[in-house]
């Protein structure tokens, strides 16, 4: 899932992804935006 959070590293995406998917969320930074996944 692409979320509307700008990023330069996956660490910046981890908290917003965890808010959506819970503690086991996966976070990636692609093309300057966060991508979250449920693990």
From Swiss-Prot:
<feature type="disulfide bond">
    <location>
        <begin position="13"/>
        <end position="34"/>
    </location>
</feature>
<feature type="disulfide bond">
    <location>
        <begin position="17"/>
        <end position="36"/>
    </location>
</feature>
<comment type="similarity">
    <text>Belongs to the short scorpion toxin superfamily. Potassium channel inhibitor family. Alpha-KTx 02 subfamily.</text>
</comment>
<keyword id="KW-0632">Potassium channel impairing toxin</keyword>
<protein>
    <recommendedName>
        <fullName>Potassium channel toxin alpha-KTx 2.17</fullName>
    </recommendedName>
</protein>
<keyword id="KW-1220">Voltage-gated potassium channel impairing toxin</keyword>
<keyword id="KW-0528">Neurotoxin</keyword>
<dbReference type="InterPro" id="IPR001947">
    <property type="entry name" value="Scorpion_toxinS_K_inh"/>
</dbReference>
<dbReference type="InterPro" id="IPR036574">
    <property type="entry name" value="Scorpion_toxin-like_sf"/>
</dbReference>
<keyword id="KW-0964">Secreted</keyword>
<keyword id="KW-0027">Amidation</keyword>
<keyword id="KW-0872">Ion channel impairing toxin</keyword>
<comment type="function">
    <text>Blocks human voltage-gated potassium channels Kv1.1/KCNA1 (IC(50)=4.8 nM) and Kv1.2/KCNA2 (IC(50)=2.9 nM).</text>
</comment>
<dbReference type="Pfam" id="PF00451">
    <property type="entry name" value="Toxin_2"/>
</dbReference>
<dbReference type="GO" id="GO:0015459">
    <property type="term" value="F:potassium channel regulator activity"/>
</dbReference>
<keyword id="KW-0800">Toxin</keyword>
<dbReference type="GO" id="GO:0090729">
    <property type="term" value="F:toxin activity"/>
</dbReference>
<feature type="site" description="Basic residue of the functional dyad">
    <location>
        <position position="28"/>
    </location>
</feature>
<feature type="modified residue" description="Isoleucine amide">
    <location>
        <position position="39"/>
    </location>
</feature>
<dbReference type="GO" id="GO:0005576">
    <property type="term" value="C:extracellular region"/>
</dbReference>
<dbReference type="GO" id="GO:0008200">
    <property type="term" value="F:ion channel inhibitor activity"/>
</dbReference>
<keyword id="KW-1015">Disulfide bond</keyword>
<feature type="disulfide bond">
    <location>
        <begin position="7"/>
        <end position="29"/>
    </location>
</feature>
